[in-house]
Amino acid sequence: MIYGQDFSDRMIELAQEKMPNAKLFQGDFSNGLAEPLLKQKYDAIIATYSLHHLTDSQKVNFLKNLLMLLNEGGCIYIGDVAFKSREALEKCRDTVGEGWDDDEIYFVYDELKLHFPTMQFEQMSDCAGLILLK
């Protein structure tokens, strides 16, 4: 079974058309997951280009809550704007210049790893990475 949550009613509608059996909910995850999602256990939880809207402390709390929803052996997969270090983030910010979005709080692996020692990270491009958390 596929479960999901999105802020946009339109995205929920489009996803439901492609996955008619999925259980999808509209809601702002910065206020928490929809109640029915909290009653399930998951083999995998996937978040793509969304968690950068949370502050670093909100990310830590949110990820800790997601970890409690995993089945044994489950994994959280996060694809987002992400960097191995603060230095790499600053280098990218300098390169991008005025195109940089200061309203978004991007992942810095070296800093988040302090809260999640088993976290894994793979840089996928100059500004995107894959984070795995078990």
Regions found by a protein language model. Name each.
Residues I46:
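A conserved beta-strand element that flanks and buttresses the S-adenosyl-L-methionine
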Residues Y49-H53:
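Short catalytic micro-motifs in class I SAM-dependent methyltransferases
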Residues Y42-D43:
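Local beta-strand N-terminus motif with an aromatic residue
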Residues V60-E72:
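A short glycine-rich, Lys/Arg-flanked "PGG" loop and its adjoining helix->strand segment in the class I
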Residues T55-K59, R86:
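Short N-terminal helix/helix-N-cap motif within the alpha/beta-hydrolase-1
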Residues M1-P36, Y77-K134:
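Class I (Rossmann-like) S-adenosyl-L-methionine-dependent methyltransferase catalytic domain
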